[in-house]
Design a protein with these regions (language model features):
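Non-catalytic interface/linker regions that flank or bridge core catalytic/transmembrane domains
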Residues: 1-35
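A general alpha-helix detector
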Residues: 3-8, 59, 132-136
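Acidic/proline-rich low-complexity IDRs
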Residues: 10-11, 22, 53, 171-173
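Generic detection of long, well-ordered alpha-helical segments
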Residues: 13-17, 50-53, 141
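Generic N-terminal helix/loop capping motif
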Residues: 14, 26, 30, 59, ...
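Divalent metal-dependent catalytic cores for phosphoryl transfer on phosphate-bearing substrates
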Residues: 37-45, 51, 63-174
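Conserved hydrophobic/aromatic pocket- or pore-lining residues that grip, position, or stack substrates
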Residues: 56
Length: 174
């Protein structure tokens, strides 16, 4: 997990974006490096969010260099590593909490669900994580219009903004 954190910080600092050091402090404090990425699917485990974000960067870096070499490298880094930032939570509350099930019979102790290890935090008002990601990042760094769009639309046809995307795709979003 420490390697993932170090690599993430190294990449984000390499963008030279004013305020990035402050964003890194907030990411650490909010649990970005220890948060799961989902409730039960991809990387639903401690540290899954940071690992997923670094994996996305690896793919975006390779593909953008081949398909869209004109896209700014700093934008690729920022969008890849911050696209799911809101999944860590906000307002001092984690986005996901452990899904504890009641024990029964001989195993009366509560236990973490093996099929859905996490659930959305009922103490955190629901806001799309894409919106949270932009809000959190924008407190510290200036995102370009294209970076905002790419983060907001990163779930494509599977996200809540699917109807706003068609015909407005950009190389950074793709």
């Amino acid at each position: 997990m420490e390697n993932i954190k170090n690599r993430t910080e190294e990449l984000l600092l390499s963008t030279g974006r004013q305020g990035i050091a402050d964003l890194l402090v907030e990411m650490d404090e909010m649990g970005f490096y220890t948060a799961p990425c989902s409730t039960q699917y991809h990387l639903a485990c401690p540290g899954g969010l940071a690992e997923h974000s670094l994996n996305v960067y690896g793919l975006m870096d390779k593909l953008s260099g081949i398909l869209y070499p004109e896209v700014d490298k700093s934008s690729v880094i920022l969008c890849a590593l911050l696209h799911d930032l809101g999944k860590a939570g906000q307002f001092g509350k984690p986005n996901y909490i452990i899904n504890m099930l009641k024990g029964r019979g001989k195993n009366a102790e509560p236990y973490q669900s093996p099929t859905k290890p996490y659930i959305g935090n009922p103490d955190l008002l629901y806001i799309d994580h894409e919106v949270r990601s932009i809000q959190i990042a924008s407190r510290h760094i200036d995102l370009t219009e294209d970076e905002n769009w790419a983060i907001l639309m990163h779930n494509g046809m599977y996200g809540n903004f699917k109807y706003q995307i068609q015909g407005k795709e950009t190389p950074l979003y793709l």
